[in-house]
């Protein structure tokens, strides 16, 4: 399995790029906020149980996808202070352990564009 690991600041366009890549590749998108929202519905953001549950969801998804023989998966990720230091290495270990490959792509944009994107109503919940 090819895991396309899109990372960058919040609002930089990871989900937009992921959706376009999904159209081109046929790979499903695993949006970071699916795990964040799940853990956050039960635990306070950043609390030890939140961090543990979020990471378990992320890693279990990668493990199951790789073991199931998916051709690929697109993951959106924004590092924050609550992410365990060894997380990325654990992702690589899981995917590569199943014969897969992790492809990292950092997304960036200008400060002006980032400010515009964050202010965009579509980002408000």
Regions found by a protein language model. Name each.
Residues 3:
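Walker A (P-loop) ATP-phosphate-binding motif of ABC ATPase nucleotide-binding domains
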Residues 6:
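Hydrophobic anchor at the beta1->P-loop junction of P-loop NTPases
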Residues 10:
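The conserved Walker
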Residues 13:
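Conserved glycine(s) of the Walker
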Residues 16-66:
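Conserved substrate/cofactor phosphate-moiety recognition/catalytic segment
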Residues 35-36, 80, 108-113:
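Conserved nucleotide-binding/hydrolysis micro-motifs of P-loop NTPases
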Residues 70-75, 99-103:
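Loop/turn-to-beta-strand initiation segments
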Residues 95-125:
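A glycine- and Lys/Arg-enriched "phosphate-lid" helix/loop adjacent to the NTP-binding pocket
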